[in-house]
Regions:
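C-terminal regulatory/oligomerization modules of transcriptional regulators
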Residues: 1-8, 27-46, 55-58, 63, ...
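Short, Lys/Arg-rich nucleic-acid/phosphate-binding segment
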Residues: 66-72
Length: 121
């Protein structure tokens, strides 16, 4: 059986895979907020929001601090450089593949033109 090791990048992508968590990050990008404020904004229960914040916290994207009864959330110090580099590698790969596909399409159009066929658009 294959076993997979969860890495930091896996945790980040798992955290970012949910629209609510992406919204929380966007909201925290403007200013810190309590879990109660976030729950109200996203029309969720406190328990539901705590779970979302926990996932973001495990990925290092959010930090929380409890003062009295209020848990305040803020963006984590960790940036997404590793994730951006991973995405960039695949962007470059696909750009190269699409460039090659464009060349093949251009060659086929030239062949059709040379054979007297009406070129496709």
């Amino acid at each position: 059986m294959v076993q997979y090791v969860t890495t930091r990048i896996d945790a980040s992508f798992a955290a970012l895979s949910d629209a609510t968590r992406r919204g929380v990050l966007e909201r925290l990008g403007r200013s810190d907020a309590s879990i109660t404020e976030l729950a109200d904004k996203f029309h969720m229960t406190l328990t539901g929001m705590k779970k979302h914040v926990g996932v973001l916290e495990q990925a290092g994207l959010v930090t929380t601090q409890k003062v009295g009864r209020v848990r305040t959330c803020r963006l984590g110090l960790r940036r997404l450089e590793e994730e951006a580099a991973w995405i960039e590698r695949y962007r470059q790969l696909w750009d190269a593949r699409f460039d090659e596909l464009d060349k093949v399409i251009d060659e086929l159009k030239q062949q059709e033109k040379a054979n007297g066929r009406k070129p496709r658009e």
